Amino acid sequence: MKTFSAKPAEVKRDWYVIDATDKVLGRVASEVARRLRGKHKPEFTPHVDTGDYIIIVNAAKLRVTGTKETDKKYYRHSGYPGGIYETTFGKMQQRFPGRALEKAVKGMLPKGPLGYAMIKKLKVYAEAEHPHEAQQPKALEI
């Protein structure tokens, strides 16, 4: 029996919607990364993007455990000397709801062209509405 290798043109992608209300950041991120990569499918092939599209709604209502609301820090740099910026999870959720989830999922995906293609299939929305009703997404419970 030959080893099966999925072809990019043969991959069937489904659309799923996840409600992140009162869900823990890391638990949602790990499951989303697994599904974006396609590891839940029997035809998973490491060098082919076999994952599904994931829509996350109510990202503003995501939570973290313990004191991570104030203690978890995110860093970025402007490129200039002394241009480092830091923000906490709580401030990031207020200013850009959903960005913390995007960063968590992106860190769990492969680096390189394949990972960049996978992260484009993630759609995050702060509120309950999303513009992807035409794709008829299935509800996914985590």
Swiss-Prot record:
CDD domains: Ribosomal_L13
Biological process annotations from GO: negative regulation of translation; translation
GO molecular function, one term: mRNA binding
Subunit structure: Part of the 50S ribosomal subunit.
Keyword hit for Ribonucleoprotein: yes
UniProt xrefs under InterPro entries: Ribosomal_uL13, Ribosomal_uL13_bac-type, Ribosomal_uL13_sf
Superkingdom as given in the UniProt entry: Bacteria
Family: Belongs to the universal ribosomal protein uL13 family.
Transmembrane portions of the chain: none
UniProt lineage: Bacteria, Pseudomonadati, Pseudomonadota, Betaproteobacteria, Burkholderiales
Name this protein carries in UniProt: Large ribosomal subunit protein uL13
Annotated keywords: Ribonucleoprotein, Ribosomal protein
Function field: This protein is one of the early assembly proteins of the 50S ribosomal subunit, although it is not seen to bind rRNA by itself. It is important during the early stages of 50S assembly.
SUPFAM superfamilies according to UniProt: Ribosomal protein L13
GO cellular component, one term: cytosolic large ribosomal subunit
Pfam families per UniProt: Ribosomal_L13
NCBIfam families cross-referenced by the UniProt entry: rplM_bact
